[in-house]
From Swiss-Prot:
Listed Pfam families: Ank (PF00023), Ank_2 (PF12796), PK_Tyr_Ser-Thr (PF07714)
Taxonomy, superkingdom: Eukaryota
Main location: cytoplasm
Protein name (database record): Integrin-linked protein kinase homolog pat-4
Domain Protein kinase: 210-465
Record bears the keyword Transmembrane helix: no
Gene label: pat-4
Length: 466
């Protein structure tokens, strides 16, 4: 019997493997943590009974190597525990400067407040961590924000470093006398709790446990609903299958676990599924900005300049590189802006919930504009999937740089036929940067064997950001 099938007597719903990983992080056992993370079904953003994430414990314990490992694999920097502490609160309060610096470099919210109204700077000042206070102030931490008791970081500061911290604040243009009263923002729902561990432990769920609130969309694939499950915001996809036979139900049960990929920051995993014919439901985390297609082409508050466009492209390339490293590979994830989601930190993630099952839409292509000529004329089993995905990525690059929908003037069938048989291609307009123009052309090489792989283009995109 495997470890994952043993359960604690005092917590019958908590597998030993989950309990162990929190212990390994607290102990600083980097080797065991790495082994646990290498299983892509393990969700590194889960919380324990008090909603402490693995990153919370690494930050509190000062385990730099583990913190680096978690951050590199997509740990959510601004997740909060039950007391509304972020990992930055804990690192600052316990004097772990290396981790503070790493969290700040990952866009940690420097002025986040916990249930007491305390910011990370409050704790750095209270414990006299002068260098950490300077790091925080340099990144925008405010010295004049009051906690629930009306006290600023300088009010609670250790006398020995108060004058130094005051000078640092003044050098950064802050006026400590302009006190900012405490404002309770918890009602706004802006805080991001760690995921309940049950979200990544459950694979099969009962449809009746889903509270589906609002229908977001309906298409040939099925219905998309926003709702709640276990108190968490989720999106449920109810698949459109004419008749759910015993074989289809069995195939669904066999195929969906491969979509539970938690091990990469640029992949949005399937959390669970409900297999209750006639209902087949896929459950994933709700993303506030929706799909990249929505961000680019529909009403969205996101401002996309050239730098943000390249960052989106880099996120997508990193996610695709990881997918291409899997053995066996996913056969039916069709890359397009409709199948990429954007989280609250403007990180692009490949949506595993948009992967097609073997029984879905067989022989049909509803978004051919992003597909390579060979993908439109061959079955996935007979295709060089890596090369076909690179063509799709080139169309995404074109879309990010032009802000246009490819072949929007053509119906899908005509578009697909012309791409496959008549040489229809996107036109790269003048004004696109020369290096981006060249990258698009390389990725869209007519010879699939001459297209690069994602590991080769990631360094190119990284240089474009610098």
């Amino acid at each position: 019997m495997s470890l994952s099938t043993h359960y604690h007597a005092h917590k019958p719903n908590v597998p030993i493997i989950m309990e162990d990983v929190f212990g390994w992080v607290r102990e600083g056992n980097a080797f065991q943590v790495r082994v646990w993370l290498d299983d892509h079904e393990h969700d590194l953003n889960v919380g324990d009974d008090h909603a402490f994430s693995l990153l919370h414990w690494a930050a509190k314990g000062g385990h730099v190597a583990i913190a680096e490992m978690l951050l590199s694999r997509g740990a959510r920097v601004n997740s909060t525990n039950m007391g509304d502490d972020t990992s930055l609160h804990l690192a600052a309060a316990h004097g772990h400067r290396q981790i503070v610096v790493k969290l700040l470099s990952r866009k940690a919210d420097v002025n986040a407040t916990n249930e007491h109204g305390m910011t990370p700077l409050h704790y750095a000042c209270f414990w006299g961590y002068e260098q950490i206070a300077e790091d925080l102030i340099s990144c925008g931490a405010a010295v004049n924000v009051c906690n629930k008791k009306g006290m600023t970081p300088l009010d609670v500061c250790q006398p020995m470093c108060k004058n130094t911290i005051l000078e640092i604040a003044q050098e950064h243009g802050q006026s400590p006398n302009d006190r900012v009263p405490f404002k309770d923002t918890t009602w706004k729902g802006t805080k991001s709790r760690t995921r309940d561990a049950t979200l990544s432990r459950y694979t099969g769920v009962d449809v009746s446990s889903l509270n589906l609130i609002t229908k977001i969309a309906e298409s040939h694939s099925g219905e998309l609903w926003r709702g709640k499950w276990q108190g968490n915001d989720i999106v449920a996809r109810i698949l459109n299958v004419q008749e759910v036979t015993a074989r289809i139900s069995r195939d669904f049960q066999t195929e969906f676990p491969a979509l539970r990929i938690f091990a990469h920051p640029n992949i949005c995993a399937v959390l669970a599924a409900a297999n209750q014919p006639p209902n087949l439901v896929i459950i994933s985390q709700y993303m506030p900005f929706g799909s990249l297609y929505n961000v680019l082409h529909e009403q969205s508050s996101v401002v996309i300049d050239h730098g943000q466009a390249v960052r989106f492209a880099l996120d997508i390339a990193r996610g695709m590189s990881y997918l291409h490293s899997l053995d066996p590979m996913l056969l039916r994830f069709y890359l397009s802006s409709k199948h990429v989601v954007v989280d609250e930190e403007l990180t692009a993630k490949l949506s595993m919930a948009d992967t097609k099952f073997s029984f879905q839409e067989v022989g049909k292509a509803y978004s051919p504009a992003w597909m390579s000529p060979e993908a439109l004329s061959r079955a996935p089993e007979d295709l060089n999937i890596r090369a076909a995905d690179m063509w799709s990525f080139a169309i995404l690059l074109w879309e990010l740089n032009t802000r246009e929908v490819p072949f929007s003037d053509l119906p899908p069938m005509e578009c697909g036929m012309k791409i496959a048989l008549e040489g229809l291609r996107v036109h790269i307009p003048p004004g696109i940067a020369r290096n981006m123009n060249r990258l698009m052309n390389i990725c869209m090489n007519e010879d699939p064997g001459r297209r690069p792989n994602f590991d080769q283009i990631i360094p190119i995109l990284e240089r474009m950001i610098l």
